[in-house]
């Protein structure tokens, strides 16, 4: 049982002596702090990642030099649940929680030594994606894209139905963007995560849902 001691009333000039802590106790406390800090660092680095934008393909909404934070929570959560229902497609929409029009960072190929791309998610698994007449259509309905200033052209991968673990991405700067119109749909295991914050420059700080 913990002991309870009665608090003494001290005068204004009285100094209550503090018990001296042994060097062993101090060392244990330092080790605890170091352990907690290490766990926090590993946890945060698993769930989020920071990137600097180097591409113009998302202008005018994102510019080179801006810095963003990407949530990797879905990717990490899916990998932690190995052996469960997520194991078949650990990076599926259910695991990552991706939604259309979110800004997503992903790898174009399986070579993850190459810099990732940042694009807008247009099509989810099972969607019928079609690009014609200057617009993008999902399941035969035209997608409103108020963030665009020019029509959308396409010469390849212009009409397709996405597979069970495939995603279709487009850049906002359509005339210069290298995206799913050129390299096709992206499998879920290449997705890093969605952009949740632009934190630099500070005057352009933005939170993304």
Label the model's feature ranges.
Residues 1-209:
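Extended hydrophobic leader/signal-anchor segments used for secretion and membrane insertion
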